[in-house]
């Protein structure tokens, strides 16, 4: 059995630890921070807003926030990070100053009206390109008034932007969403003194009466990153894997539950229940069966491309529905997944809010089909999750991926671990 501590700190928690420190007003410590491109964007923006960031150990920082955020002289560059842009928009909505947030071509093509509308409900002065649909975003910080908002989509980023504004508004605000999205923001902020109550799925957020408490967070391993190696174990015969020190928040492990329903043997062992649930995940290969995914999409949206690879080895027709938001990620992930699978000779098709994949009998059938075609170059579309999903197939096929380097956005150790996985030399790493 391979034991693997992926050393890939959770992306969601890393972003939030940096951004929330700016509301603490006292030094905060973030340990085991994810040194990927997206999270580094959040860290750099914090510095541009006046925070002092000191490197105190490997992947660990002391963040000393300013008493009042500084109006930056330059654009706040979010690069490829939608989390940075959306959460900072909420944070800055009530701060004194003019703030401009922009990103790369991919981020500036992603939908931003989904956060502009709830922020405007507070009275936020915010503008976006093309009638508020896209970044760059311009925010003129101003006093906010509490509001009630029902989000048409389940999105942790939208919810988090709303909460950060609500904490700075006059009066108690309420937020509803169609299904539960990731709840790290609520968990972390409540632990730091914020008054946030969940009443039958409706969040009630009261304004901060004092700065957030200073904190010392150690970030656990990211289940979304760990899932790529769970996928590898699920599709490689006779494989057994132990993923160590993984965040086991129930809103983050739905993809593991889906893989379990498909037939993979999976067991989670809880090791600690402090701020978040952390533990180990044991995975053992078994024959996979087809599945339909049409619920709890918000809790597994990031893992659907990888699940698409699992469906390739699940006998029968697998279907994904109600996942239109996949088209608004770093790439159109529905199109990216299906176009690459078709290039491999797989029977599959996309539709507006999902896709279907006709699974194969076994690996030998995939290798046989592969031998009958000219090996395609897999197009990552510069999307880290598409690149890593198809990279798992290189464990059994001589595939070339046009840009595996984009994995560094969320999982800088991925290529090294994948190579060690190929060599079967991961024990103890």
Curated annotation (Swiss-Prot):
This is 3-phosphoshikimate 1-carboxyvinyltransferase. GO terms for molecular function: 3-phosphoshikimate 1-carboxyvinyltransferase activity. It is an enzyme of class 2 (transferase). It comes from Helicobacter acinonychis (strain Sheeba). Pathway: Metabolic intermediate biosynthesis; chorismate biosynthesis; chorismate from D-erythrose 4-phosphate and phosphoenolpyruvate: step 6/7. The keyword Cytoplasm applies. It is found in: Cytoplasm. Its main location: cytoplasm. 3-phosphoshikimate binds at residues 11-12, 16, 155, 157, 302, 329. It catalyses: 3-phosphoshikimate + phosphoenolpyruvate = 5-O-(1-carboxyvinyl)-3-phosphoshikimate + phosphate. Belongs to the EPSP synthase family. Monomer. It comes from the Bacteria. Catalyzes the transfer of the enolpyruvyl moiety of phosphoenolpyruvate (PEP) to the 5-hydroxyl of shikimate-3-phosphate (S3P) to produce enolpyruvyl shikimate-3-phosphate and inorganic phosphate. GO terms for biological process: amino acid biosynthetic process; aromatic amino acid family biosynthetic process; chorismate biosynthetic process. GO terms for cellular component: cytoplasm. InterPro entries: Enolpyruvate_Tfrase_dom, Enolpyruvate_Tfrase_sf, EPSP_synthase, EPSP_synthase_CS, RNA3'P_cycl/enolpyr_Trfase_a/b.
């Amino acid at each position: 059995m391979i034991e693997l501590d992926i050393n890939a700190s959770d992306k969601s928690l890393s972003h939030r630890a940096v951004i929330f420190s700016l509301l603490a007003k006292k030094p905060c410590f973030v340990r085991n921070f994810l040194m990927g491109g997206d999270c580094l964007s959040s860290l750099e923006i914090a510095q541009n807003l006046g925070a002092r960031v000191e490197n105190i150990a490997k992947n660990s920082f002391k963040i000393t926030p300013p008493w009042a955020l500084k109006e930056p002289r330059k654009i706040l560059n979010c690069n490829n990070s939608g989390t940075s842009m959306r959460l900072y928009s909420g944070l800055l909505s009530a701060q004194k100053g003019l703030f401009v947030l922009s990103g790369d071509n991919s981020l500036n093509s992603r939908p931003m009206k989904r956060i502009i509308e709830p922020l405007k409900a507070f009275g936020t002065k915010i503008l976006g390109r093309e009638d508020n649909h896209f970044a760059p975003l311009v925010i003129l910080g101003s006093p906010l008034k509490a509001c009630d908002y029902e989000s048409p989509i389940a999105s942790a980023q939208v919810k988090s932007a709303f909460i950060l504004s609500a904490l700075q508004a006059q009066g108690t605000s309420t937020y509803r969403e169609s299904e539960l999205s990731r709840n790290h923001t609520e968990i972390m902020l409540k632990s730091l003194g914020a008054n946030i109550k969940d009443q039958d799925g409706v969040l009630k957020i009261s304004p901060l009466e004092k700065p957030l408490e200073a904190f010392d967070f150690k970030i656990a391993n990211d289940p979304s990153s760990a899932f790529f190696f769970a996928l590898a174990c699920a599709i490689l015969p006779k494989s057994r894997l132990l993923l160590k020190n993984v965040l086991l928040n129930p809103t983050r492990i739905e993809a593991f539950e889906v893989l379990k329903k498909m037939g993979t043997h999976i067991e989670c062992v809880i090791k600690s229940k402090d701020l978040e649930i952390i533990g180990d995940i044991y995975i053992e290969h078994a024959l996979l069966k087809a599945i339909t995914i049409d619920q709890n999409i918000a809790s597994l949206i990031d893992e659907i491309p990888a699940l698409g690879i699992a469906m390739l080895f699940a006998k029968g027709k697998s279907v994904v529905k109600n996942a239109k938001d996949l088209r608004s990620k770093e790439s159109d992930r529905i199109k990216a997944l299906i176009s690459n699978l078709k290039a491999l000779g797989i029977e599959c098709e996309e539709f507006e809010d999902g896709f279907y994949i006709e699974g194969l009998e076994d690996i030998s059938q995939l290798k046989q089909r592969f031998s009958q075609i000219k090996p395609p170059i897999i197009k990552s579309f510069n999307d880290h999750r598409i690149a890593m999903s198809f990279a798992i197939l290189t464990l059994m096929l001589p595939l070339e991926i046009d840009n595996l380097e984009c994995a560094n956005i969320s999982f800088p150790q991925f290529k090294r671990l994948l190579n060690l996985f190929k060599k079967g030399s991961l024990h103890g790493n």
